[in-house]
A protein has these predicted regions:
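Canonical AAA+ ATPase core
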Residues: 35-40, 47, 51-90, 94-99, ...
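C-terminal engagement/docking regions of AAA+ P-loop ATPases
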Residues: 36, 41-47, 286-289, 311-401
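Conserved, well-folded catalytic cores of nucleic-acid-processing
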Residues: 19, 23-30, 55-59, 114-121, ...
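Basic, amphipathic alpha-helical bundle interface domains used for macromolecular binding and assembly
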Residues: 14-15, 155-159, 192, 225-337
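Short, contiguous clusters of charged residues that form electrostatic/catalytic patches at enzyme active sites
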Residues: 18, 22, 129, 282
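Conserved interaction-surface patches within small, structured recognition/assembly domains
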Residues: 2-8, 145-146, 286-293
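Short amphipathic alpha-helical segments at helix boundaries and their inter-helical linkers
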Residues: 31, 126, 297, 334-342
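Pre-Walker A (pre-P-loop) alpha-helix and adjacent loop at the N terminus of AAA/AAA+ ATPase modules
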Residues: 2-41, 116, 306
Length: 401
């Protein structure tokens, strides 16, 4: 596989590269960011996502823990009730951030967990224990699903598991086996998915709308339209190039990957301290109300996405463009096309900068609260005579009677 740093970047896949980096940064600080890439088959969606496995940073876990327990916050059935001293005695180890895939042939037990047959059939010491599935083993990492629209259509049980995992941050998963107690495990995992909405069974939002809403952001993967880029892609995928690359690029590849890892760790530190200014938060809230959006997940994703986007772009503060850049990514799969067009036209017609800055410069007190607000060309109330202030029926109808 072509290493991540050598993958060709062009306008059509720029958004996916950004979302991949943003999701890794968020995952490293324990905040999953679920992303979905849509596009024509063969445009490189899965290639980019799988290649990102090579740049994932390390995480620290309790030594030998298959649930990837954080030593500072153990969550698995074996370690969550242990004291800090007991955890310290077990020791810790560093491993690459998990990256696991759910295939379309996977069973519920493979994904969630099942009886550990190796221990159950151990002749010397047989015992019944649960073996965590792919999702619990991917805790603090990434789960990737290719052609998720097909999975949503053909595997409703696995889709239900994903809904639980992605419903909250962190999510949870329940492992059930006959004869054993039910185990509920916290899981902090970012779900990455790819699909072609133009092929059967269609877009995810038309198959399981709940699952579609669970994805924080969705981007559409465009085709390359440059002769130079396509020529370079062909070259890097030729047999001769791959054979030569094995010999000359092993050390170079690791060095390049380390640069990505260092940046990710740096960005994660910045993200933990970063926040969105109130005037931008007010703008996002106004979008939710004005355009009658359904899911609060949408504006939560818009907030975290704007912060992450500003960080990977090297900015110290969140810019207005970071927020507007998130609008189509966050709302494409949540609103109909007419609503999306109205929102984009609304932002364009009013002027993004002027519209958002009106919140930044808005005074907290209304003008009416200002004692100088009302004009002073009227007679003060204290100077009006009672006869002028209180009208009787006779004064109002002087010509009657």
């Amino acid at each position: 596989m072509i290493p991540f740093y050598k993958l060709e970047r062009y306008e059509g896949n720029e958004a996916l590269f950004e979302l991949v980096m943003m999701s890794i940064v968020a995952s490293l600080v324990g905040e999953p960011l679920h992303i979905h890439a849509e596009g024509l088959r063969g445009t490189g969606k899965t290639t980019i996502m799988r290649a990102a496995k090579g740049i994932l940073p390390n995480i620290t876990r309790i030594k030998g823990c298959v649930y990837n327990c954080d030593p500072a916050a153990p969550h698995c059935p074996h370690h969550r009730n242990m004291s800090p001293n007991e955890i310290s005695n077990l020791g810790t180890e560093e491993i690459p951030m998990p990256f696991l895939e759910i295939s379309h042939s996977a069973k519920v037990g493979t994904v969630a967990g099942s009886v550990d047959l190796a221990r159950l059939t151990d002749i010397s010491h047989p015992e019944a224990q649960l073996l965590p599935g792919l999702i619990p083993q991917a805790h603090r990492g990434i789960i990737f699903i290719d052609e998720i629209n097909r999975l949503a259509d053909t595997s409703p049980e696995i889709t239900d598991i994903l809904l639980d995992v992605m419903g909250n941050k962190p999510g949870h998963i329940q492992i059930e086996e006959a004869g054993l107690p039910v185990v509920d495990v916290t899981v902090s995992v970012s779900v990455w998915a790819a699909s072609n909405p133009d092929e059967d069974p269609g877009p995810v939002e038309e198959i399981r709308r709940q699952l579609s809403d669970r994805f924080d952001m969705v981007c559409y993967m465009g085709r390359p339209n440059s002769v130079d880029i396509l020529s370079q892609m062909l070259k890097e995928n030729s047999h001769q190039w791959k054979a030569q690359a094995k010999e000359r690029e092993a050390a170079v590849e690791e060095g390049k990957n380390e640069v990505f890892r260092s940046n990710i760790v740096k960005w994660a530190g910045q993200y933990e301290k970063a926040d969105l200014p109130d005037f931008l938060r007010n703008y996002i809230a106004r979008l939710y109300i004005k355009h009658n959006l359904e899911s609060i997940r949408a504006i939560e994703a818009m907030q975290s996405g704007a912060i992450l986007h500003s960080i990977i772009k090297g900015r110290d503060k969140v810019a207005i463009n970071d927020v507007t850049h998130m609008i189509p990514l966050v709302l494409k799969h949540r609103v109909d096309s007419d609503t999306m067009v109205r929102m984009i036209n609304d932002v364009d017609s009013k002027g993004v900068k002027d519209g958002i800055l009106s919140f930044k410069n808005r005074k907290k007190n209304d003008k009416e609260a200002d004692p100088d607000y009302f004009p002073h060309n009227a007679t003060p109330l204290k100077d009006i005579r009672r006869s002028d202030l209180v009208n009787t029926e006779k004064s109002l109808t002087p010509n009657e009677g």
